[in-house]
């Protein structure tokens, strides 16, 4: 991950500008301390490939975190603020339209996705194909997209069985977590909650939750679990700052206004 943002690429979103003085590590640090505007800047970085690999799912993840932290009322506020003609804006709106009008004819959405030569479009097309009952063809599309570097597709193929209640494969998640940090949060949930044999591993779950916190993607549920484990004498070492950040995550959000 590059430390310094390219001075050639400046993005402006919701009245904020990503500047060369910002770095990914600096923005992550600010986000971990509850700065919703830092999440919006991180979303912009993933959108434009500034300091990080350009990534649709990374953009969506950070925009969702900005919403949860109260920087925006809803993720749509961020999406609709993107420049017209943005591929990521179009992809999000196409998928949103499919979810909203799933009972209606989805052919036009599928046709639009097929015209877009990107792994992200292929992933969304694969998801629709699975949803329509052709699991094998859909998963093959998603696997192709994963091979082409789509992080959302990489995350989706960690689910070995799409029938019934999907449960991700922990080994596959661990392999991609350094590229798809949200996998750390999913791993935490997997190990915290009892498996099919009724067993859980809270210590390992907490370790993964804290890795998610390092990448600014820990949610309230995970933070509550870490604090509960820690305060009940669990085998985890937290600094005073760790505890403060976890407590900030647990706090109810309040929408930021200027």
Task: Please place each PLM-identified region on the residue numbering.
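TPR/TPR-like (Sel1-like) alpha-helical repeat modules
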Residues: 57-70, 146-147, 203-217, 243-252
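Short helix-capping/linker turns of helical repeat alpha-solenoids
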Residues: 32-35, 48-50, 67-72, 83-87, ...
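Hydrophobic/aromatic packing residues within the alpha-helices of TPR/SEL1-like helical repeat arrays
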Residues: 27, 63, 109, 113, ...
């Amino acid at each position: 991950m590059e430390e310094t943002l390219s001075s050639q690429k400046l993005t402006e979103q919701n009245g904020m500008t990503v500047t060369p003085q910002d770095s990914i590590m600096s923005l992550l640090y600010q986000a971990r301390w509850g700065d919703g505007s830092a999440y919006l800047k991180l979303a912009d970085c993933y959108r434009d490939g500034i300091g990080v690999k350009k990534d649709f799912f990374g953009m969506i993840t950070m925009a969702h975190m900005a919403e949860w932290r109260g920087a925006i009322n809803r993720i749509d506020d961020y999406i609709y603020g993107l420049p017209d003609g943005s591929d990521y804006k179009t992809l999000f709106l196409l998928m949103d339209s499919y979810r909203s009008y799933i009972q209606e004819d989805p052919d036009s959405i599928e046709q639009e996705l097929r015209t877009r030569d990107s792994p992200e479009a292929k992933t969304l097309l694969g998801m629709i194909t699975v949803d329509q009952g052709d699991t094998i063809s859909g998963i093959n599309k998603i696997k192709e997209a994963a091979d082409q570097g789509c992080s959302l597709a990489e995350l989706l193929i960690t689910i070995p069985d799409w029938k019934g209640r999907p449960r991700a494969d922990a080994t596959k998640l661990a392999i991609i977590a350094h590229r798809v940090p949200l996998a750390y949060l999913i791993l935490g949930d997997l190990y915290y909650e009892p498996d099919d044999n009724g067993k859980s591993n809270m210590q390992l779950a907490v370790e993964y939750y804290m890795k998610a916190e390092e990448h600014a993607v820990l949610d309230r549920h995970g933070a509550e679990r870490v604090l509960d484990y820690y305060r009940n004498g669990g085998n985890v070492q937290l600094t005073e700052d760790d505890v403060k950040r976890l407590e900030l995550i647990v706090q109810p959000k309040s929408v930021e206004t200027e």
